[in-house]
Curated annotation (Swiss-Prot):
Protein name per the record: Pyruvate formate-lyase 1-activating enzyme
Binding site for [4Fe-4S] cluster: 30, 34, 37
EC numbers for this chain: 1.97.1.4
GO molecular function annotation: 4 iron, 4 sulfur cluster binding; [formate-C-acetyltransferase]-activating enzyme activity; metal ion binding
PANTHER family: PYRUVATE FORMATE-LYASE 1-ACTIVATING ENZYME (PTHR30352:SF5), PYRUVATE FORMATE-LYASE-ACTIVATING ENZYME (PTHR30352)
EC class: oxidoreductase
């Protein structure tokens, strides 16, 4: 009997979570507590709804033409997809049987390395790894947990030579200092499996979800970064030998 997945929702024609037009599956449950999270309602491990790989694939294949025509595919996001690694592995296997490209969007908070993680990565064409912050003190303040597990996962991907894009959320006053950006550059320097770095400007599009849940949004007064700030960060990271986009 196939493993059931607990999902929050899906987006049929996503264009920002991997190449081309993609079917984005938002898995339910996350162990990080990002203060800027725009999917606050995905944290609860018991929330969402259950679905089988078979039923999910019935939905996915209806969009195959759009995905194939644009070099797209499917992306497992969240929440945190790796918390349900067995289900995502089975889903990606089904996608590969249909010739559909697979992408794993993850924060890298992997607690146990076992055959399921390896089997998931074996059927993953691209990993989008969210490196939130290299300064661990800032990371714990902003994200709620240490960054050790994510950094370990980044090194694991390097060891596997796994195709990877790094994603870095630029939050003014938190992740945009020259010192912290240099820490990121130094960490990923020489990681030849990294194809590019994506700078994701902080935004406030998810604030209403916090308020709907009756929760305080601590970054209420933080404004998005300026283009000049993003260009400056881009220049620093390019100095470490990587392609950088925003």
């Amino acid at each position: 009997m196939s493993v059931l997945g607990r999902i929050h929702s899906f987006e049929s024609c996503g264009t920002v979570d991997g190449p081309g037009i993609r079917f984005i599956l938002f898995m339910q449950g996350c162990l990080m507590r990002c203060k800027y999270c725009h999917n606050r309602d995905t944290w609860d491990l018991e929330g969402g709804k259950e679905i089988s790989v078979e039923d999910l694939m019935k939905e996915v294949v209806t969009y195959r033409h759009f995905m194939n025509a644009t070099g797209g595919g499917v992306t497992a996001s969240g929440g945190e997809a790796v918390l349900q690694a067995e289900f995502v592995r089975d889903w990606f296997r089904a996608c590969k049987e249909e010739g559909i490209n697979t992408c794993l969007d993850t924060n890298g908070f992997v607690r146990h390395y076992d055959h399921i993680i390896d089997e998931l990565l074996d059927v993953t064409d691209l990993v989008l790894l969210d490196l939130k912050e290299l300064n661990d003190q800032v990371h714990q303040n902003l994200i709620g947990v240490p960054n050790k597990r994510t950094l370990e996962f980044a090194k694991y991907l390097q060891k596997r030579n796994q195709h990877t894009w790094i994603r870095y959320v630029v939050v003014p006053g938190y992740t945009d200092s020259d010192h912290d950006v240099h820490l990121l550059g130094q960490f990923i320097e020489g990681m030849t499996n990294i194809e590019k770095v994506e700078l994701l400007p902080y935004h406030r599009l998810g604030v209403h979800k916090w308020k709907t849940l009756g929760l305080d949004y601590e970054l209420e007064n933080v404004l998005p970064p300026t283009k000049e700030s993003l260009e400056h960060i881009k220049t620093i990271l390019e100095g470490y030998g990587h392609t950088v986009k925003f």
